[in-house]
């Protein structure tokens, strides 16, 4: 019995902190702790050293769990009992921290929704006319306005995502030899090409999302301007804007089809030249 006690006393005298590597002889007043199942040189550690190490691992989150880096045993960390006031404040702080992400998401969604409602109302007044648009919205059901107005930018964006020019271009390339008038409008559209170039994936374009968004939201303004320039004799604001939008989409689509066809032909007639460097002399 005395031998086992002497061995345990000797082990305690040989204690070494695995954080700072100090022993009992270096600091006899330090508080020691054995927080895990480790044996040997990693069994003991200073309370102050372990507290600093736990602070580094938790990084300000006092509820985070910390384990021993050697045996992976979780440290048993206890705190003094809180008073009722501090307990209520701590509970309120944790509840607020958990609720803030949901509140931020709700605020973001609400902001986007009311922005869409405002944009829809402005678009109605722009397309129909300021006075006529206000009269229409005043007579409409509020629930219909809250649902219908924010769908206006959504419909515009979805409509902008339809790449109808690509479908028209594929059909023209396929049936252009049967319609000779297309060759006069778009030169080279029906001519055979030496190779079929690889076309870029439209989803891989990082600018496409911003272009779709901006183009869709600006479209009512452009349709109104084009309608006033090309169809000034039409008295109805709505009809003039619709005609302006159709004309703009058709003209823009024709130019886009022509531009893509020329790019297609340019890639199809691409050649790789011989190297201009002199060949090495044979030894």
UniProtKB/Swiss-Prot annotation:
Binding site for Zn(2+) 1: 17, 20, 46, 49
Transmembrane segments: 102-122, 142-162, 212-232, 241-261
Record membrane topology: Multi-pass membrane protein
Cell compartments where the protein resides: Mitochondrion outer membrane; Endoplasmic reticulum membrane
Zinc found in the keyword field: yes
SMART domains named among the record's database cross-references: RINGv (SM00744)
Residues annotated to bind Zn(2+) 2: 36, 38, 68, 71
EC nos: 2.3.2.27
Catalysis performed (reactions): S-ubiquitinyl-[E2 ubiquitin-conjugating enzyme]-L-cysteine + [acceptor protein]-L-lysine = [E2 ubiquitin-conjugating enzyme]-L-cysteine + N(6)-ubiquitinyl-[acceptor protein]-L-lysine
GO biological process assignments: protein autoubiquitination; protein polyubiquitination; regulation of mitochondrial fission
Pathway in which the depicted protein is active: Protein modification; protein ubiquitination
A single GO molecular function term of this UniProt record: zinc ion binding
Stretches annotated zinc finger (RING-CH-type): 9-78
Keywords: Endoplasmic reticulum, Membrane, Metal-binding, Mitochondrion, Mitochondrion outer membrane, Transferase, Transmembrane, Transmembrane helix, Ubl conjugation pathway, Zinc, Zinc-finger
Record-linked PROSITE patterns: ZF_RING_CH (PS51292)
Pfam families referenced in this protein's UniProt entry, alphabetically: RINGv
Main function: Mitochondrial E3 ubiquitin-protein ligase that plays a crucial role in the control of mitochondrial morphology by acting as a positive regulator of mitochondrial fission. May play a role in the prevention of cell senescence acting as a regulator of mitochondrial quality control.
Annotated domain remarks: The RING-CH-type zinc finger domain is required for E3 ligase activity.
Name this protein carries in UniProt: E3 ubiquitin-protein ligase MARCHF5
Source organism: Xenopus laevis
């Amino acid at each position: 019995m005395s031998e086992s006690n002497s061995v345990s006393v000797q082990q305690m005298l040989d204690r070494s902190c695995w954080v700072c590597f100090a022993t009992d002889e270096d600091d006899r007043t330090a508080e020691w702790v054995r927080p895990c199942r480790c044996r040997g040189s990693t069994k003991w550690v200073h309370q102050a050293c372990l507290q600093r190490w736990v602070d580094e691992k938790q990084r300000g989150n006092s509820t985070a769990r910390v384990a021993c880096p050697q045996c992976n045993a979780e440290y048993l960390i206890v705190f003094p009992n809180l008073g009722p006031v501090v307990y209520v404040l701590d509970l309120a702080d944790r509840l607020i921290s958990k609720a803030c992400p949901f509140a931020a998401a709700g605020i973001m969604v609400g902001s986007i929704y009311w922005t869409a409602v405002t944009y829809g109302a402005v678009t109605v007044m722009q397309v129909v006319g300021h006075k006529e648009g206000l009269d229409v919205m005043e007579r409409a059901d509020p629930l219909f306005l809250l649902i219908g107005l924010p769908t206006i930018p959504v419909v515009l964006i979805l409509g902008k995502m339809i790449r109808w020019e690509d479908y028209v271009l594929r059909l023209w390339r396929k049936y252009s030899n049967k319609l000779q008038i297309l060759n006069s409008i778009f030169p080279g559209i029906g001519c055979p090409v030496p190779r079929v170039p690889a076309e870029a994936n439209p989803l891989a374009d990082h600018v496409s999302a911003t272009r779709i968004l901006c183009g869709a939201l600006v479209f009512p303004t452009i349709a109104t301007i084009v309608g006033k320039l090309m169809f000034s004799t039409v008295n109805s604001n709505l009809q003039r804007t619709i005609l302006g939008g159709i004309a703009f989409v058709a003209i823009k689509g024709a130019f886009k089809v022509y531009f893509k066809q020329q790019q297609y032909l340019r890639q199809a007639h691409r050649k790789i030249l011989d190297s201009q460097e002199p060949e090495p002399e044979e030894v």
